[in-house]
Every structure is written in C-alpha cells, then in structure tokens.
C-alpha cells in the first residue's frame, strides 16, 4: 500500500509518479509532487519509482486574488 494525500491506495511493482498521476486522474497542469517529503521535478515523473509504503503528496497550484 501507498498513501496518496492521506488516503491508502494499492501499490504495484514498477509504479512511477507519472503512472500514478494518470491512473488517479490528476490532469491539472500545475501540480507539485512530493514522495516521502522529497520534491519530484516534473521532468522526473516518468522515471521516479514509487515504492511500497511510500507517502505521496500531490498538490494543485492555484492562484487567488
């Protein structure tokens, strides 16, 4: 299991940040991803593996005013 934004989700071998975002429907262009508190740059999404037990945070960036 992994935790995504405080909710438990199933984990599978070979899961990447990009695959997780696609599977969970995170399509908003401006997001920040952290895995176990470590920022993951957008260019690394396809390569960054998510391990069983990881804590993933996905945050949408929204400007207000």
Language model: regions and residue ranges:
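Ubiquitin-like/PB1-type beta-grasp interaction modules and other compact soluble beta-rich domains
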Residues: 1-64
